[in-house]
């Protein structure tokens, strides 16, 4: 598939593209939960205190998925708002979706640093995987926002046309 804008895509192609955009977000976001559960078990088995940080990561991930679902419903398909948003509204949407990711990354980095001497390498790699998945989710957010802005996106490309640094 070549680069497409929402206006250029046929109805079927648009539905496929939207499914891919959503899947590219949901897959890494859900995988974060699995890795957090694994890390939590390792920390508990090692009698390392981390309940607050783990709870913050889980809460942020839940918040992220909920916000994305609302944004997806409001901005795609028959529910899409017909009026064009301002650049500030797109920036706010991008910011609101990325804020929970920053918490996920930040708390994961804190736990990695706090327990790097107490955990096996595999547990530290799990923390790094959480961070990598958060960055992958961040890229999916960029593609989603670019798409609803009407910008061309390449469904086969992992980066968006408007890639920003982490907020």
Residue ranges of model-derived segments:
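Histidine phosphotransfer helical core of two-component systems
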Residues: 6, 10-20, 29-66, 78-88, ...
């Amino acid at each position: 598939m070549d680069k497409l804008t929402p206006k250029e895509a046929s109805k079927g192609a648009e539905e496929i593209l939207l499914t891919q955009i959503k899947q590219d977000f949901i897959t890494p976001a859900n995988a974060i939960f699995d890795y957090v559960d694994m890390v939590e078990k390792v920390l508990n088995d090692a009698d390392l205190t981390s309940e607050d940080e783990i709870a913050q990561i889980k809460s942020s991930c839940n918040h992220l998925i909920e916000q994305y679902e609302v944004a997806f419903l409001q901005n795609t398909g028959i529910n899409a708002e017909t009026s064009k948003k301002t650049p500030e509204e797109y920036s706010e949407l991008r910011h609101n979706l990325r804020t929970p990711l920053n918490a996920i990354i930040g708390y994961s980095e804190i736990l990695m640093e706090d327990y790097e001497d107490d955990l096996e390498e595999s547990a530290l790699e799990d923390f790094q995987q959480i961070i990598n998945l958060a960055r992958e989710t961040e890229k999916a957010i960029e593609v989603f926002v670019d798409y609803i802005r009407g910008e061309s996106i390449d469904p086969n490309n992992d980066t968006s046309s408007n890639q920003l640094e982490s907020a």
